[in-house]
Each structure stands twice: as structure tokens, then as C-alpha cells.
């Protein structure tokens, strides 16, 4: 979690800062220097910045939604929300195949087609395992609070959920020569604009 927590700082679509610059900014603040000294016994650095972010992320509560109320028989979904739920768990959108459990993820590594060995050249899990069939695989993210966590995908290439769905509707239109795309994603979803 600590390693992951620094990614949004470096990501140009989020904070777009070098970690060193983020640490420099923290050290320029008397308040943050005092807080880091109190908690970590030293001034801010990359290691304790990651630890602070990870500790914060562990406090986030994400299971208090209307869907949670519905699943615990504490509330009802509107007709539109129920249609969305049916799409999510059904055979047309197939979201539930990869996004299930409490956090809407299986925590499995999948290649959703965002790897072509050229422009999209982050090989994902392959960088660790060196197994050819792991090229382009990334851990399936949870979808809790997904509406407020843009940008999307491991590389932040989609700015809106509509762009994400457009990709799943026509993946070959976005990336012609995807390498090792998961079989479950080789057929476009063909969702309508209303869906």
C-alpha cells in the first residue's frame, strides 16, 4: 500500500509531481514538519510520506453506499439503479466477472487490452514475473467510489467513466493491435447510449 500510495503524486493526470518535489513542499511547511517529527521522529521524506498516505488510505470507509443499504435489505434501488445493477451483474456488460466481492474486485491480474508493446508499452505484471502471458496484466481495481476517482485505468488514459465504457464497447477502435488481451474482453460489449 505504501508503494502504491505515491503513484498519484507522480501521475501527470493527478498531482504530476516528482516525489522529491512533494517532500520539498512538505519540508517548506512548518506545520507538516512538526507533524512528521511528532509521528515519525524525523522530517518528511519519501518513505514516511508513503507511510502517511498508506495510513490515511487505511482509514477510508467505503461500504456505506445506497448499494450497501440495498444489499443489506435496508433500502431500495430506483428502477434506473436496478437496471444498472442488472447490467453490471448480467451477461451483457459482464462487469461482475471481474468486479465482485465487497470492493467490486477479484484482485486478479487481467490484461484489458491497454498494451501494444509500442505506444502503450507498460508491460505490467510481466515486469515482475517475466512470464510472456503476464504482458499487459494489471491488478483489477475495486470500483468503490469509482465516480470520484478519475482518471481511469492503470495509466490514467481515460478521464471519464463514459470514456471507459466507450473503450469496452469498441476496444479495437482505441487500440488496434493489443497484445495478450484477456479472452473475456475480446468481444465488444455493444452497450447502447441509454445503457
Mark where each language-model region is.
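Periplasmic c-type cytochrome electron-transfer domains
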Residues: 1-195
Amino acid at each position: 500500500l505504501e508503494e502504491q500510495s505515491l503513484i498519484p503524486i507522480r501521475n501527470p493526470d493527478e498531482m504530476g509531481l516528482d516525489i522529491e518535489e512533494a517532500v520539498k513542499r512538505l519540508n517548506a511547511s512548518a506545520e507538516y514538519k512538526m507533524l512528521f517529527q511528532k509521528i515519525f521522529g524525523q522530517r518528511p521524506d519519501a518513505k514516511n510520506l508513503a507511510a502517511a498516505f498508506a495510513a490515511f488510505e487505511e482509514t477510508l470507509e467505503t461500504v456505506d453506499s445506497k448499494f450497501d443499504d440495498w444489499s443489506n435489505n435496508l433500502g431500495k434501488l430506483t428502477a434506473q439503479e436496478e437496471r444498472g445493477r442488472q447490467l453490471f451483474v448480467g451477461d451483457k456488460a459482464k462487469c461482475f466477472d471481474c468486479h465482485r466481492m465487497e470492493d467490486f474486485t477479484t484482485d486478479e491480474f487481467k490484461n484489458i487490452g491497454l498494451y501494444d508493446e509500442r505506444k502503450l508499452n507498460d508491460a505490467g505484471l510481466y515486469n515482475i514475473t517475466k512470464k510472456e502471458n503476464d504482458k499487459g496484466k494489471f491488478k483489477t481495481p475495486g470500483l468503490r467510489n469509482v465516480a470520484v476517482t478519475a482518471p481511469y485505468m492503470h495509466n490514467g488514459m481515460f478521464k471519464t467513466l463514459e470514456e471507459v465504457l466507450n473503450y469496452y464497447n469498441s476496444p479495437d477502435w482505441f487500440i488496434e493491435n493489443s497484445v495478450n488481451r484477456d479472452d473475456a474482453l475480446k468481444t465488444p460489449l455493444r452497450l447502447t447510449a441509454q445503457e
